[in-house]
């Protein structure tokens, strides 16, 4: 559980966090941030681990994923399994295919399709997510995934493709309206 506060009132933060900890002993990871920007972005904020681990573990079809507070992971794991299975099925990835996973997060989809692909390249802007993607790939004994951190519109260029290879399959999750025009043009 990650609780976001606006006011940096240590006394009240500790009172609430202790209440949550005592009231819900099944919580294995209790974190908080103080975000005085009054918005819902937290990637530039410090995460404080109040109790337990600063991550959770998730299993999906035999793959194991460590997920930190700033790492993207689908919130409904059961539906994510269905989505990833369908993605793999529809993409018809073969052992000869180079796959790009744009907005890879913790590398979940990249690793999910890696067993069918020659190589998978994942890109995301969140450094913590890419670090977790590498850790997860190692944890899952997946050696054909490479991950890059950077702003998609800056990193996903002709030079990047020349260096890493022209993809046979590109996966974007989500296929967002907010995808920068340069990224859409590159695809």
Model-derived regions, located:
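Rossmann-like S-adenosyl-L-methionine
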Residues: 12-187
């Amino acid at each position: 559980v990650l609780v976001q506060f606006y006011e940096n009132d240590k006394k009240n933060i500790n009172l609430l966090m202790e209440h949550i900890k005592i009231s819900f002993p099944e919580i294995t990871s209790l974190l908080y941030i103080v975000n005085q920007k009054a918005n819902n972005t937290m990637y530039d904020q410090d995460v404080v681990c109040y109790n337990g681990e600063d991550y959770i573990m998730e299993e999906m079809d035999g793959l194991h994923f460590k997920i930190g507070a700033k790492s993207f992971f689908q919130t409904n794991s059961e539906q994510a399994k269905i989505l990833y299975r369908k993605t793999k099925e529809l993409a018809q990835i073969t052992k000869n295919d180079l796959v790009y996973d744009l907005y890879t997060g913790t590398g979940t989809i990249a690793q999910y399709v890696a067993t069918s692909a020659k190589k998978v390249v994942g890109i995301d802007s969140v450094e913590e997510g890419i670090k977790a993607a590498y850790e997860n790939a190692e944890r899952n004994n997946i050696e054909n995934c490479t991950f890059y951190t950077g702003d998609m519109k800056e990193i996903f260029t002709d030079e990047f493709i020349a260096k890493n290879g022209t993809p046979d399959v590109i996966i974007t999750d989500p296929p967002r309206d907010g995808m920068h025009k340069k990224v859409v043009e590159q695809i």
